[in-house]
Amino acid sequence: MDSNKRPDTMERITTPELAESFIAEQIAAVREQVGDKKVLLALSGGVDSSVVAALLIKAIGKQLVCVHVNHGLMRKGESEQVIEVFGKELDANLVYIDATDRFLDKLAGVAEPEKKRKIIGEEFVRVFEEESGKLEGISFLAQGTIYPDILESDGVKAHHNVGGLPEDFKFEGLVEPVKLLYKDEVRVVGKALGLPAEMVDRQPFPGPGLGVRCTGAITRDRLHALRESDAILREEFDKAGLTSQIWQFFTVVPDITSTGVKDGKRLDYWPVIIRAVNTVDAMHCTVPRIDWEILEKITNRILNEVDGVCRVCYDMSPKPIATIEWE
C-alpha cells in the first residue's frame, strides 16, 4: 500500500471525537517508529508545524527537538507566541534562534522580489543546518507535510518544508503524522491538542514572511511600520468580527513615499495599503466590502500610532488581474 495515498475508507476529521481518535493512532505510530531516538522539527509557528509539534510532544516528549528560526520577518508577536506556547506551556525542547540581523543584513539593498525570496530561503537553510549540526543524536526529521502537498507533487513529496535540506543531511527516516490530512482537518486536530485558536486558525502566510509585503529593498524602519500597521488591522478586524469572515487580510508598505503635511510642514512619509480578499481556491479572489466606520477607525489608528506613515489606502483589485500578495 502506498503510504502517501489517503485510503478511500479514511473518514474526514470534522469533530473533536474523530480528532482524538486520530491523535491516539498517531501517538502509537510515532512511538513505534522512533522508539527512544530523537526527532528534529523546524517549527515556524504556522498551522502545520505547530500541530505536528504538539502531537509529537504528546507522543515522545523531550525526544522532540524543535528549532524556531526568527528571521526578523515575522508578524508582531509570532515568535513570542511560539516561545510562550511551546517553550513554556507545553515545556517543549525548544531551540530559539534570533537571526534577525543576519537576514536583514543579507537583504540590505535587494529590491528584486525573486532575489529576496531566494536569499531568505537559502539563508534559512544555512541557519537551520548550522544549528542542527550542534545537536547530537538526532535520528529522525519531522515535517508538517499535509495531503495537498503530496497531491500537488503527483504523490512524490519533495520534503522541503524546512526550507530545502541539503542532500548530505541524513536521517533514519521522516516523521510526518499529518501527511494524509487536509488543511481543515489539521486545524480540527490542532484544536483537539489544545493549541490556541489564533495559532490553529492562522491565515496563509508567505514563506518569506513580511519580506514580500515590505516591497522593494527592505529597511528596518519600514519593516517596523509594516509590522505595527498589520497588528492594528488584525486587532480591529477581530473586534469587528471580521476575522472569520475574510479569507486573508494584511497590510503592505511599498518602497515609495507620499507627500504629507503636519504642523504646517511638508512630510515625505510612506503609504500603508490594506489588502483583504475572499476566495475558495486562491486562484480567483474578490475584495470584501468593509464597513466605512471600520476602515476609518483603522486609518486613524495607523496614522496616529505608526511612525513614518501619512496615507492609508484600501486595495480594491480582484484576482485576476492582481495577485493576492504585492510581490
Give a label for each model feature.
Residues M1-S139, P148, D154-E327:
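RNA-binding accessory domains that recognize and position tRNA/RNA substrates
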